Amino acid sequence: MDPYKYRPSSAYNTPFCTTNSGAPIWNNTAVMSVGERGPILLEDYQLIEKIATFTRERIPERVVHRRGASAKGFFEVTHDISNLTCADFLRAPGVQTPVIVRFSTVIHERGSPETLRDPRGFAVKFYTREGNFDLVGNNFPVFFVRDAMQFPDVIRAFKPNPKSHLQEPWRYLDFCSYHPESLLSFAWFYDDVGIPINYRHMEGFGVQAYSLINKSGKARLVKFHWKPTCGVKSMMEEEAIRIGGTNHSHATQDLYESIAAGNFPEWRLYIQTIDYEDQNKYDFEPLDTTITWPEDVVPLQPVGRLVLNKNIDNFFAENEMLAFSMSLVPGIHYSDDKMLQARSFAYADTQRHRLGPNYLQLPVNAPKCPHHNNHHEGFMNFMHRDEEVNYFPSRYDPCRHAEKFPMPPNVLTGKRERCVIPKENNNFKQAGDRYRSWAPDRQDRFVKRFVEALSDPRVTDEVRNIWISYWSQADRSLGQKIASRLNVRPNI
């Protein structure tokens, strides 16, 4: 008998219970002991295995995006962008690619209410014919900091106090007071969209600028946008308190039940593109993740649609073990965006920590196309490889290099040094523009929320004055409103 022919596939493929090694169990309700009232015997392997498995069934939580829900479906190209990219899954209208999507809250812990104010994750894994493409983003188009060196710090600032394990506004207001570029992110965070009504009515953004490369090797910067066809909807604090008090998983439940009922969620994918040679023509830095590309300057272009039409079969196998690692395919590449380049390491590294070095062998993470390399063995390797050559090149193995795909030369010059993005951006303009675009009642709600955060007793007068100064530079009336409600005289 070929032992590799019979691989574990289902927990229910025998009519009776077995041990992990397959031995039949005739009693799964009582321990082995010395008589009815005697002690348990160490030889009760069945009990030891059951308890040992139980105490090890949890894996490390994600460091961020711990609370999440997943669903499966497809992406279909609706508009021809073959002039922009040679990516196979975007080659022509009508092409469909299977996907799995994970929605999440960013900061809060696994099991926390989905009604808390928090950015949401929007991650899509495309199982293409040329490998997996992971597009990992959020429901905000911007991030709080622009340099990757500060990424761990901003996450820690938003997470609970390490002494009390309480999430306190003074911590992130203190940290971000050193980062005026965070203003636009706060204009999203404390806006109505800070609490989406569910995942189906939520936008998604790639946040960072990627590169699209076409067949001739021409490269363009690109940003990705997901727009829900059912519209964007959010909930106010009162509704969030009411729903969160009765159901911590309302968004997960809504997603699951909608798909089960045949009400399939759908999003449209749009892109913005900038020619590499045109990067310096704009009054904003295209590689800065703390600002957006104005749509009146860089218009949206439609690409395709994302449809989620199948629920996952097992939450642990297809949500907890689902791993996004910024995977790329020919025709899509990283840009010089510093946050993106750091994420390309961080995402894969955290999956190796959570799931082990062979996390890409797990069915939910493995590519659906043929794949081959000499990365083998290591913890939890379960791929049977009948081979004698595990190196490259070799005259005994027909494996060869693939056909080279277009990759433009990128000539770089500069000193090796630690420095910020050189172009001086206006940290306040887009935040002010966003605030002024709201109706008066929406503006008032934003002011109320930010004033409540600044009213944390641990927030010092110095920090309050810094934030009043920042918001005054974004919009003078906004700064005055915040100062008035705090009974503080603005300095600007």
UniProtKB/Swiss-Prot annotation:
The keyword Hydrolase does not apply. Its EC number is 1.11.1.6. GO terms for cellular component: peroxisome; plasma membrane. Keywords: Heme, Hydrogen peroxide, Iron, Metal-binding, Oxidoreductase, Peroxidase, Peroxisome. Pfam families: Catalase, Catalase-rel. Signal peptide: none annotated. One of its GO terms (biological process) is response to hydrogen peroxide. Heme binds at residue 347. Belongs to the catalase family. Occurs in almost all aerobically respiring organisms and serves to protect cells from the toxic effects of hydrogen peroxide. PANTHER family: CATALASE (PTHR11465:SF49). This is Catalase isozyme 3. It comes from Cucurbita pepo. The lineage of its organism: Eukaryota, Viridiplantae, Streptophyta, Embryophyta, Tracheophyta.
